[in-house]
Amino acid sequence: MSEVTAQNGDTVSVHYVGKFPGGKVFDTSMKAEAVKAGLFNLARDYKPLQVVLGKHQVISGFEEALLGMKINETKEVTLPPEKAYGRSGNHPMAGKTLLFRLLVTNIKRP
C-alpha cells in the first residue's frame, strides 16, 4: 500500500458500495456490484467517485472515513443518521443508518 494518506485538500478517488443494515445495496460505483444487486443502469458511468476532502461534497461520515486512508486500502464503516442524511428531513434516507465499503484508488495532492 502507498504511504500517502488522504488529508483535507486532497482529491480522493474512491469506489464504494452503500448498503442498509439488512444488507440491501442502495448505491455503488462498481458495475459488478450494481449488476449483482439488481441496480445496474446502462446510462450510468461506473467509475470511482472523486471527492475533494474538506469541501463537504459528500455526507460527513463518508468524508471522515476517507481521511487517513491510503491508496488500495479498503474500509467498512457504519454511519448513523447524524453522519449521513440527518435524523429527519425531506431526503429519502433521513433517519437511516448506512453502511459503506470504501476502496481508495487514487489520492491527488493539490
Question: What kind of region is each of these model predictions?
Answer:
Residues 1-110:
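FKBP-type peptidyl-prolyl cis-trans isomerases
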